[in-house]
Amino acid sequence: MGNTGGAARDAERYRLGYPGQEAEEDPRAAQNEEFYANQRRCLPDRMLIDDLHAQWFGQSARLERGHGFIQWLFPIREPGMNYQAAPLTLREATAMREQPAVRQRLLKSYELMLDFYGMRLADAETGEVGRREAGHAAGYDNLNHSSHNYLRITRVLKCLGELGLARLQAPWCRFLVREVLDREGGGGLLPNCADSLENYWVPVVKDEAAREGLLRQIDILIRGGGGGGGGGGGGGGGGGGGGGGGGVGASERTLPPVLQAVEKPRDAVRSEGGAAGAEQDDDAKDWSDAADDK
């Protein structure tokens, strides 16, 4: 199942606020803050954020092909593949969290990407996410087969947590659990996303109770929940975190039909090996085609 140990360490480091990293950050850096204040243009697209929101919403082909905008719309405290964008700093994140205009723009960035994936923010207060009312199938098909978007989703979730909208993380992941795994519940339409969902998306949810509940739900849907609530047993360890790896190694799992059909393709397209080495390696390998984010 890939570098799940590295993924777990990456997620924990994110949730803990990147211990020790502040000393290495430039206290004068303000690139992300200025972009979200609509005062700096992103590069290489040379657009202000308000113009990007207005002109790119619903432009699926442009969002799929573009490789430089995602690091600007969703800055995180990790380097990305766009050398013209800068990692978020703790000083920037702290300042931006206090600005209502930043949160409003971040919400628009989030809605832009949800729409691209065939989804919509049904309730901005509760964070409830649903399928886009028209044409969700095209977005789902692209997401199910365009694996660089799995890296984008990891980045979006992390950014929501950094800039004051952590409350939106769990509701989106809850929706994704259904859409990826729960065929009996009317979902199961995004099976290729299963590995990323379990090992990269849910583990960065900052709300501990919500995160562990989601991991238990995933365990039940994938493995029947036979492992109990312990901390990570055999090969299931890293990505399951507090949700209970159940002591069942990847090679021993009996996958439900929705996953059996895609186990080989999922291995082939997996594009997240943890923020340590493998995720960067995948980015470097696929940059010329599509991989635009770590």
Residue ranges, per PLM feature:
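Acidic-enriched, low-complexity/disordered segments with a strong bias for Aspartate over Glutamate
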Residues: 10, 26, 45, 50-51, ...
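Alpha-helical bundle/repeat cores within regulatory domains of eukaryotic proteins
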Residues: 125-226, 249-269
